């Protein structure tokens, strides 16, 4: 069964699992990528590098009997085939078809395959994405009829997830299936071209649920030494520099490290020669009185503004400099560590010509000479994998490759074991401080699979609901492993623009678990979709 600890109401905003797709295929041959195999139109899927877990996991072909993309994977130890799509838009909604089958002679129950907790029996945790547009769509239907009972050999099931309407001009989407993979290149067709009744699906759906979205994906990075972090969407970039590194204690005098910390901002300014709006805002903790903190925050913001003018030409930018004192903390001021997070200066750049940047959409530069932190756990090449411990048991963790799609990298870490492993999800979460700096909501998500590149730690892509809850595109539950079976942890990251990547699961404490998985996977090939 799955392992997911009940959590606050934030879970109700069901996390999109930003997933993994698959093996490289020849783009010139019209290949579509998903899971762990080569996806070819009209042909059989050929396996790619398999490192570790056995079994038919995540191999997809582009065309199934219903016109969708076929994903061959594994669920709870059973071979599973899911034909995903096509999808059709009608009015305010997009409807997809999942045709689910297995070669297992044993019953395979699907009630927890695509959702957990209060949403069992539905496809509520499936996510539809348009990575080219940096958009994610939550599932709205909540239909409990489709996935009741079991699927067995010769007795498939159909499910029909419902999402908000896609934008005009979208011809294909990505679809994330929890613990299975991300299917890429799912065709968007006319209502008349699908072999199911779109009106009937919409009529049966419970459409009084979550905000239909879509929600914008954001990219976030943290400097190797934690002195700054950056978030970015399609309109703006915000660099937050730590007050304790940039300034002397209780002072507006810049430290010797200030220029290297501000290098991230300088690089962002240089990317947009036409300029735009530049907002610099100082913040403090709550240690002194309000008046002192307000004055200090204003002086620090002004000091950053003046220093940036000396470091680079910012004359094309319309600048606004202010301080907010202790009035806008990132986290509660209830511990020394959290007060340190709140002492900061935020620099937001909103370029007038966002397309002007020649860098990767995720780019948030830092000096390439920045020291890569020493590994805190086992190290191995991604396709070969490493052994890690969970609940005192040994698991093998691998990742064959990642795929570049629409300004993102997608991939999945695969877990296998020769013994039964009771596996909670909390050991796969970021350290508490890093999670709070990013403002991630809740505690039960796979969020610790970061990429190290060019002096920065790239966090998993994430998005925020209207109520402010921010969640990564990854699993929010995992299943206990049985001997000889596999489980996939699909993830999406910002594109770092390299031919191979290193995934690092950083060390650090986390309030909700006594153990965290700490490891590093290197030399992971990047394949262009």
Question: Can you annotate each of these PLM segments?
Answer:
Residues 147-148, 246-255, 290-294, 477-478:
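Second-shell loop/turn segments in exported
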Residues 46-120, 133, 192, 196-240, ...:
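Extracytoplasmic low-complexity, Pro/Thr/Ser/Ala/Gly-rich segments
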Residues 223-236, 246-281, 305, 309-312, ...:
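Periplasmic peptidoglycan-binding/anchoring modules of Gram-negative envelope and division proteins
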Residues 67-70, 149-217, 351, 373-386, ...:
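Surface-exposed edge beta-strand/loop patches
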């Amino acid at each position: 069964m799955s392992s997911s600890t009940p959590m606050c109401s934030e879970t109700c905003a069901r996390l999109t699992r930003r997933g993994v797709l698959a093996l490289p295929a020849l783009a010139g041959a019209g290949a579509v990528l998903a899971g762990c195999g080569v996806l070819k139109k009209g042909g059989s899927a050929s396996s790619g590098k398999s490192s570790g877990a056995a079994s038919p996991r995540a191999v997809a072909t582009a065309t199934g009997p219903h016109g969708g993309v076929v994903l061959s994977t594994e669920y709870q130890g059973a071979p599973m085939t899911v034909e995903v799509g096509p999808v059709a838009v009608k009015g305010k909604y997009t409807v997809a078809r999942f045709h689910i089958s297995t070669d297992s002679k044993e019953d395979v129950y699907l009630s927890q395959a695509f959702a957990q907790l209060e949403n069992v029996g539905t496809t509520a945790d499936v996510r539809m994405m348009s990575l080219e547009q940096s958009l994610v769509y939550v599932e709205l239907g909540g239909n409990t009829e489709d996935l009741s009972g079991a699927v067995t050999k010769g007795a498939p099931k159909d499910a029909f997830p419902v999402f908000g309407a896609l934008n005009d001009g979208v011809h294909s989407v990505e679809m994330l299936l929890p613990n299975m993979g991300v299917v890429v290149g799912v065709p968007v067709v006319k209502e008349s071209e699908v072999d199911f009744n779109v009106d009937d699906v919409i009529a049966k759906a419970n459409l009084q649920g979550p905000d239909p979205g879509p929600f914008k994906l954001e990219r976030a990075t943290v400097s190797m030494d934690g002195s700054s972090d950056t978030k970015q969407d399609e309109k703006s970039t915000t660099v937050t520099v730590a007050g304790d590194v940039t300034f002397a204690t209780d002072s507006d005098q810049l430290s010797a490290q200030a220029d290297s910390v501000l290098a991230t901002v300088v690089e962002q300014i240089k990317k947009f020669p036409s300029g735009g709006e530049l907002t610099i805002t100082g913040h403090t903790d709550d240690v002194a009185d309000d008046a002192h903190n307000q004055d200090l925050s204003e002086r620090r913001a002004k000091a950053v503004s003046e220093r940036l003018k000396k470091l680079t030409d910012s004359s094309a930018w319309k600048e606004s400099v202010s301080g907010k004192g202790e009035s806008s903390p990132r986290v509660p001021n209830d511990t020394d560590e959290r007060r340190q997070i709140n002492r900061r200066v935020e620099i937001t750049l909103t370029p007038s010509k966002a397309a002007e940047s020649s860098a990767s959409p995720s780019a948030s530069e830092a000096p390439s000479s920045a020291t890569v932190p020493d590994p805190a756990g086992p190290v191995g090449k991604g396709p070969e994998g490493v052994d890690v411990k969970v609940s005192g048991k040994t698991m093998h963790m691998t990742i064959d490759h990642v795929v570049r799609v629409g300004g993102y990298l997608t991939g999945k870490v695969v877990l296998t074991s020769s013994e039964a492993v009771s596996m909670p999800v909390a050991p796969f979460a970021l350290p508490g401080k890093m999670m709070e700096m990013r403002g991630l909501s809740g505690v039960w998500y796979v969020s610790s699979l970061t990429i190290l590149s060019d002096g920065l730690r790239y966090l998993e892509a994430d998005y925020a609901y209207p109520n402010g809850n921010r969640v990564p595109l990854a699993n929010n539950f995992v299943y206990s492993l049985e001997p000889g079976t596999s489980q996939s942890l699909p993830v999406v990251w910002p594109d770092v623009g390299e031919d191979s990547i290193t995934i690092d699961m950083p060390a650090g404490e986390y309030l909700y678990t006594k153990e965290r998985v700490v490891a590093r996977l290197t030399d992971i090939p990047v394949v262009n979709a």
